[in-house]
Each structure stands twice: as C-alpha cells, then as structure tokens.
Design a protein with these regions (language model features):
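Histidine (H) residue identity feature
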Residues: 30, 38, 45, 57, ...
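Eukaryotic transcription-regulatory low-complexity IDRs
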Residues: 124-125, 129-185
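Core nucleic-acid recognition elements
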Residues: 43, 57-58, 65-75, 86-92, ...
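Cys/His-rich Zn2+-coordinating "finger/knuckle" modules used by eukaryotic regulatory proteins
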Residues: 87-143
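N-terminal intrinsically disordered, charge-rich regulatory segments that carry short linear motifs
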Residues: 1-89
Length: 185
C-alpha cells in the first residue's frame, strides 16, 4: 500500500484491518507503518534500536531518537567472530558511566565507546509514534549508520543473572550463547 501520509498531518487515513502492517522491531530507513491499535509492541513503542524520548512540541506525537551503539575502541573480535555491539543506556548519567569501561572481551585491552547514530543528515535517526482510534502510526526518518545493538532482552537477561555489574562476564555469556545456538542449528 502506498504510504502518502505524514505523521504531522492533521488527519491521517482510516485503514481497514487488512491494510495494517506486521510489527517491525528493526525499522530502518525512511518508512511508515500503521499497526493495530491493540498491538502490544506498538503500544509500548518497542524498537530493537536503542531509542530515547526526545523533545517534540506536538503532544500527540511521540518522538524518539537513536542513541547509537557501544563498541570496543580497538574494534576487537570475539572468539565466535562477532564484534562488540552493546546497547547504550537510555539515561544520560548511566550512558556516561558505560563509556570508558573495559571491553567485555577478555582478550582485549580496549575500552567501550559510543558510536553515535548519524543516519539522518548527520543527526540521529528519529522514530515518530502517533496513536489514533484506528491504529498506531509509525514513521522513521533516516538510515542507521551503525550495527544493531544487542537485543534488549539480552541485556535484561544479563542484569537478572547478575552479569551486568561485571562486564567481563559478557564475553563468556556470548560464547556460551553462540555455542548453544550452534547446537540448536
């Protein structure tokens, strides 16, 4: 379906159930979706990207900006061949604390640093959300110029297991996770 509406339009289209989109956790690029008003992920404004609420002067539209990704300063490689792409904290203070911490790869002397998102004309990619009785309208502006961060549930799992305080354990957890995935495949 051709998406000719803009999130800022005074009136957005009314769509039938068959015209609604499947939820996209990793929306990337200039795109528009309309989700079912009862979709839990859409209601929570879920995204795989690390997004934080940013100032928007329209109270009917929620604006979120991408925070980028935490990477190793020496761009090391884990034993499984993957690179460090951690989810930055949403809170400014917590994000500042993340920077400069030792790389979770035990074989690396690098430090964690933020690779900011600059995929929208040099500015962070933005996601816009608007709730109507008919659906939840989503619009993204920009293309992420960095790798995907670890999934949010991975970070929460590490925290629940008590691994969040000792980032060195991340490499071990990633290696175990990779080995488990290989066994399942």
């Amino acid at each position: 379906m051709l998406r000719e509406w803009d999130i800022n339009d005074t009136a957005v289209p009314i769509l039938s159930e068959s015209e609604l989109d499947e939820f996209q956790e990793w929306a990337n690029g200039h795109c528009r979706f309309v989700y079912n008003a009862h979709n839990e992920d859409a209601k929570k404004h879920t995204s795989g990207w690390a997004m934080r609420n940013t100032n928007n002067h329209n109270v009917n539209i929620l604006k979120k900006s991408c925070l980028g990704v935490l990477v190793c300063s020496v761009v090391c490689t884990l034993p499984n061949g993957a690179q460090i792409n951690l989810r930055p904290a949403i809170c400014d203070k917590a994000r500042r604390k993340q920077q400069g911490k030792p790389c979770p790869n035990r074989n690396c002397s690098g430090r964690l640093e933020i690779r900011p998102c600059r995929g929208h004309c040099g500015y962070p990619v933005t996601h816009f959300w608007r709730h109507t009785d008919n659906g939840i309208f989503f619009q993204a502006k920009g293309v992420h110029d960095h790798a995907k961060p670890e999934a949010k549930n991975c970070r929460e799992t590490r925290r629940c297991l008590g691994l969040g305080k000792r980032s060195r354990n991340l490499a071990l957890m990633l290696a175990r996770d990779n080995a488990l995935n290989k066994k399942v495949s």
